[in-house]
Amino acid sequence: MDKEMRRPSKLTLGAVQLGLRYGIANRDGMPDESAAQEILEEAWQRGITSFDTAAAYGESERRIGAFVKRHPELASHLFIATKGALEPTVTLDDEAYKSALFERLEISKTALNVPEVPLYMAHRYEDYRRRLNAYTSFFGQAKDQGHIRLAGISLYTPEEAEEVLRLSRKAPLLDALQIPFNLFDRRFLENELLDKLKAAGFMLFIRSVYLQGLLFLSPDTLPSALREAAPLLRRLQSLSSETGVGLREMALGYAHERAAPDSILIGVETVTQLRENLDAYEKRLPSGLIEEIDHTFSKVPTPVLDPRKW
């Protein structure tokens, strides 16, 4: 495969669960080393060639690096995205801040066992915006020197994406964005924002397709911060029963058809979950279900949509 043409697979293995316990519906905890490698092997065998990780995800980068080390012949075919950040309290000048970003990047490259990271992202938009000059210089230099192929940011809100669009007209150094999108959260469709991001040439990754597992929880056992989600989950479960479409199938199919991203992140703790996700993705939703989902979940309270508020 020509390295210039390397792109993510339609599903990306979100590897945060491989490095730490993650997700409100996580019942299995973090897999051990053997189980993590089995998940990576199964993902590759089933056609997933892109992995998403971050320096902040515990053992995740190192475990992906162990997979790469065992399969050096696959390195040129893998699309690995990782993220880096400095502590928000860091008060270095721009040049020193850039140097610190390079140090973090080198640590990630070493952990991943790669000479070049296909996609390196700023983990927090607020950091990127606050230290724009340092990040702009860092991304440009990292690309020029062959440390990274593409640069991007992980976003939370449409407002952040709108600002990225404005900034990109002045300094078009960003290539990819990671955004939340799911059955409850369609904010990026408003004002044709998703279409604008695509038209601007951004590679788009969708995360939180299961809203960090919230879609699978019982409405009767929610923590107090998520009480507003209870009626939504009841309606979702009813819709699943009425149509005979499973929640995974519905969530993945909706994201695929409604948002049409370059790739959808899926996070798993077991090989069984991985297989269930892959099987669900291969199915397509029955006619009319997209519109019914749009109508049923047109008004979702903002606190339900943002895991940072849970």
For every predicted segment, state its role.
Residues 45-48, 114-117, 148, 174, ...:
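A structural motif
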Residues 7, 67-79, 109-114, 141-143, ...:
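Acidic (Asp/Glu)-rich catalytic clusters
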Residues 125-295, 304, 310:
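Beta/alpha (TIM)-barrel catalytic core signal, keyed to glycine-rich beta->alpha loops juxtaposed to Asp/Glu
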Residues 1-78:
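N-terminal binding-site loop/beta-alpha segment at the start of enzyme catalytic domains
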Residues 20-34, 87-99, 124-129:
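Active-site mouth loops of central-metabolism enzymes
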Residues 76-89, 180-181:
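A short, structured active-site edge motif that brings together acidic residues
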Residues 109-130:
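Active-site groove signature of glycoside hydrolases
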Residues 28-42, 94-112, 158-167:
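Short, acidic/polar
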